[in-house]
Amino acid sequence: MTESTTDITLGFRSPQVCKVVGITYRQLDYWDRTGLLGPSLQEASGSGTQRLYTFQDIVTLRVVKRLKDAGTSLHKIRQAFDQLEAEVGSNWREQDITLLSDGTTIYAATSPEEVVDLLQKGQGVFGIAVRPVHDEVRGEIHRLYPDHAEEVSDLGTIAEAAGT
């Protein structure tokens, strides 16, 4: 089965994820092997098996890429994600959270006032509003896989409803 005819309702394979997120397979593999983020649907279990990622996994990977592009280390990203899981829960990706990073530290702001407060401290920071990343990912998947537009919309809706 070719990539364009793959039934993405089963999940997204590594090549699709790399295209949507804008990373190399090597990065994706490294992030999985080091425990930063692996596929939620299916791990690779030897030669010939494929990882299967959810829509939510792709959203998270897009956030990781943005933080990396801002100069944040994978160690700091991992710490921030663990902290968010502990404080907000596994559905933090659906919350109105803005992640701000100065390249060294990641701050999570849950209100516009917190964002302004962090910015007024005079630090140069890079901000990522997490919730809009859903729409960006959905749009990118629609652009890359137009034959699956309806399936992708359903996947995003299912992911948001399930909190995965």
Describe the predicted segments one by one.
Residues 13, 31, 38, 63, ...:
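Proteins with a high burden of low-complexity, intrinsically disordered sequence enriched in S/T/G/P/A and R
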Residues 7, 25, 55-58, 64, ...:
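Generic N-terminal initiation segments characterized by hydrophobic and/or small/turn-forming residues
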Residues 20, 45-49, 61, 69, ...:
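Residues in flexible loops and secondary-structure boundaries
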Residues 18-19, 33-36, 79-82, 89-91:
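Short amphipathic alpha-helical surface micro-motifs
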Residues 81-164:
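Terminal, intrinsically disordered low-complexity segments enriched in charged/polar
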Residues 56-88:
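A short, Lys/Arg-enriched interface patch at domain edges and termini
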Residues 1-60, 69:
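Basic helix-turn-helix/winged-helix DNA-binding cores
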